[in-house]
Amino acid sequence: MKSMAALPLAALAVVLAAPAYAQSDSRGDGDDYHSQDPIVITAPYVRSLDILGNVTVVEGDELARDRRGQIGDTLTRQAGVSATSFSPGSSRPVLRGFQGDRIRVLNDGIGAIDASNISVDHGVTIDPLTVERVEILRGPAVLLFGSQAIGGAVNLFDNRIARSVPQDHPHFDAIAGYGSAAEDRSAGASLDIALTPKLVAHVDGSWRKSGDLRVGGFTLAPLLQLDVLEAAAEELEEGNNEEADALLEAAVERGRVRNTGNDSWTAAGGLSFIDEGGQLGIALSYYDSNYGVPTRPGAHHHHEEGEGEAGGEEEEEAPVTIGLKQWRVDVRGEVELGSGFFDKLRIRGGFADYEHIEFEGDEVGTLFTNKGIEARTELTQADRGGWRGATGLQYMSRDFDAVGAEAFVPPTLTEQMAIFTLQEWTLGALGLEAAARYEATRVKANTLGISRSFDAFSAALGARYDFGDRSSFGVSFSRAARAPSAEELFSDGPHIATQAFEVGDPDFSSERSWGAEATLKLRGDAFSVALTGYANWFDGFIFADDTGLEEDELPVFVYRQRNARLWGFEAEASARIAQFGGFNLNADAIADLTRAKIKGGDHVPRIPPLRLLGGLELQGARLDVRAEVEWTDDQKRVAAFETPTEGFTMVNASVAWRPLADKNRVTLLLSANNIFDVNARRHASFTKDFVPLAGRDIRVTARVSF
């Protein structure tokens, strides 16, 4: 398996040894330094109106308004996006019902190299405060970034490795905000300086601190309230008055979720060389976060026999917290190759040293470490009569270890080597696209003496027909494969943070799926509409099944492999409905729905229900005013032992004011979320029954750029 690393690392070495030059920035003085042509996650050379990659871009004031402590909660206003929302300190995106190891969170095209895909209680090590642009990709083109993106990808862009030289003066960005629901205070800033006409230095940092989350209504969902009240009655009958009182207090608690505070900070620096023939840059970053892990009332932490007992009385459970940190090095470069068949060589690489500790009070429970590397090389083709594309190699390695009484996964080494290509042909109004990826994966559990190897081939084919000036209809078909993760293969033990006993299966085969997708995009001078329908048929779909059994007073979740079917739709529309006094009055709406069933009739757990969101926005040169209503349906299509979730209606409003006329350099935002303080729960969340969404949240944000 060592040879798997040789090819991409050799290519990386060639590029690092080559002279790195890049085109100097030739934009005028009035141009915004950060304004760039749209970047499409599939590759920068592919049209934004493509078939295989359904891309949503979030940036600017929209990103500033929606920023939360984790990227999952930041993106939930986008079509087809929900979040795991385990706690304010840990929330990952859910795309089309997919989460975990089927969604990749990327940092400029390569993985976050953390442990957030392993378990829902692990936070993403990218602070949204440092992110300038987010691209959400659904559809088969995401497979170019690995089989772990079989459900989609979220690509986060910062400017730690500069793409252009700031003109005339250093470039400074800053953002600061306050949110009332958790007394959330945050600030971030970045600075780019041209040390020479070809050398750019970058520094950035961020800080965030929040308290316990305030919520509308009862903390516990009705069914869990009943369970806790029954448990309190049993404790009272047995004479355990203190335990009964604690359970009664938890059952009737309103207004907040205990142990959900978060304290995090980041620091980073980068250096980039930019000239006419290419560019090369390197960045070093550090991420540190400490956050509370809310626990289900009545759930007991796992202890070794006799531990936590004295004189026959059970010791009071201490709060669980996670201390997380990551050091990371990133490299990005490209070389112009001239006018041959390939016109550009791109490289992207990263190494990270990650660890987090799960504490029970002041005592160390379990230590998780993850040392990982990911590298990509891409050769892009020059446009030849409407044909263009790219071909590349990717290597990934993850050395994961867990030490402690509740290490539910043994030490594992995962290595993956892949080759991929994406090709596009434009024939007048007709466009064709094809993508393919082959990857070899090995997962080795050293202490168990088990090593599994998987070969996965994925391919997609799509066609698009353009009609009118800006409208199109596209269809695509795909075949995808995903190797099981180490956690799905080898889990066997109690997991303190999720309060579950997790059991994997080392005999799993690769997960395979066939997919079909159709997209209609209509755009006029005053309106736009995008409709997407999709379906996937899985052979060997892997999921965590709640067995209804208990081990060490914890519910047992067993990973199983079954055939499954998933389908759904996403719809987006916007229109200008009036113009007056220098303002445009616009209306917009989104709708999304996913259905997923296991063969034999069971529903896939944690699938978001139907959602509708509509808004009215008054937009002017200096002032924007917005009001919106989000309606989420009940979710009664649940798996065995999974509880249903009540729907909710939430009203939000915001105002953005730009006091200076010069290029929106200063923006002040005031937003009121969940104005009527409703009790709302996200069905995709593992903790939904005891961690509601934030109640009324008044947020103030200031954003400066010059």
For each feature predicted by the language model, list its residue ranges:
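N-terminal periplasmic accessory domains that precede
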Residues: 62, 69-74, 91-94, 106, ...
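Transmembrane beta-barrel wall of Gram-negative outer-membrane proteins
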Residues: 180-209, 220-294, 323-338, 342, ...
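C-terminal beta-signal and adjacent terminal beta-strands/loops
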Residues: 481, 539, 636, 657-706
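Flexible loop and strand-edge segments within Gram-negative outer membrane beta-barrel domains
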Residues: 258-264, 277-344, 351-374, 405-407, ...
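Short acidic/polar hinge/loop motifs at secondary-structure boundaries
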Residues: 111-140
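Short, acidic, small-residue-rich periplasmic hinge/interaction motif at the N-terminus
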Residues: 23-64, 72, 100
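Outer membrane beta-barrel strand-and-loop segments of large Gram-negative receptors
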Residues: 372-379, 418, 505-509, 515, ...
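Gram-negative outer-membrane beta-barrel transporters
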Residues: 26-27, 389, 528-538, 555-636
